[in-house]
Amino acid sequence: MLPETTTLQPLPSVTTIMNEPPARSPMEDYYLFNQFQYNQNPYVYPPQPVYYNTWQDASTHHFDPFQSYQIPSPYEQPIQSSMCTTPLQPLEDSRIIFDESLTKNENEQKSFVEQDSSYESSGNRFGSQKGKKIAKVIRDACCSHCSTTTTTLWRKNDEGNLECNACNLYYRHNKVKRPLSLCKQKPTTRKRRQAKKE
């Protein structure tokens, strides 16, 4: 079979092309129509819950100006029991500054000044606080080996458990756990000489 012959038509002139509007597909029109619709919200939000109590006095209503529903009063929130299983917040960020200049003798209790966690990020770290030591607060800490609660420095062993300074250093030096016969109620401290002032 021979292929069918088609009749060739001449190309249109430039003026006819310039005068005719370009033919667009319906999808292009739909896209342009939807592109410039500002009054429609493209996001669909789920309906917000309404907190409203008809028995409550009108003066105690809490209203969020940015939302169109009522917020419950903080006094109406359920109180969590003391047996709740939520973990406590870590104490890693809480810091204190130990000031040795405030202590007069060894028998007096050491003075502590509460320190805000924004102290380090404020850039004033080396300004007025030069002579003060920064220590982490560890409350209710107990040595995992000798069960003491007082030490000059808390350290972590290889498993990550807290140990007192003496038990940890003894194990690092001798590679043997510290005998409980060496454990004392109060850690021993050195008697340091006072620097002579002229």
Swiss-Prot record:
GATA-type zinc finger locations on the chain: 143-167
Localization: Nucleus
UniProt-annotated stretches for the region Disordered: 1-20
Keyword Ion transport: no
One of the protein's GO biological processes: endodermal cell fate determination
Mutant phenotype after disruption: No obvious phenotype. RNAi-mediated knockdown results in no obvious phenotype. Following infection with P.aeruginosa, RNAi-mediated knockdown results in reduced survival and slight intestinal distension. Double mutation with elt-2 results in arrest at the L1 stage of larval development, reduced expression of gut-specific genes and a severe disruption to normal gut differentiation with the absence of birefringent and rhabditin granules, which are characteristic of normal gut differentiation, largely at the regions of the cell that interface with the pharyngeal and rectal valves.
Keyword vocabulary terms for this entry: Activator, Differentiation, DNA-binding, Metal-binding, Nucleus, Transcription, Transcription regulation, Zinc, Zinc-finger
Cellular component terms (Gene Ontology): nucleus
Keyword match Aminoacyl-tRNA synthetase: no
SMART domains: ZnF_GATA
GO molecular-function term, one example from the UniProt record: DNA-binding transcription factor activity, RNA polymerase II-specific
InterPro entries assigned to the protein according to its UniProt record, in alphabetical order: Transcription_factor_GATA, Znf_GATA, Znf_NHR/GATA
Skewed-composition ranges (Polar residues): 1-18
Induction: Induced by P.aeruginosa infection.
SUPFAM superfamilies: Glucocorticoid receptor-like (DNA-binding domain)
Pfam family, one: GATA
Purpose of the protein: Transcriptional activator that binds to the consensus sequence 5'-[AT]GATA[AG]-3'. Required for gut-specific differentiation, specifically acting with the GATA region-binding transcription factor elt-2 to control normal gene expression and promote normal formation of the intestine. May have a protective role in response to infection by Gram-negative bacteria such as P.aeruginosa.
Entry protein name: Transcription factor elt-7
Organism: Caenorhabditis elegans
Gene: elt-7
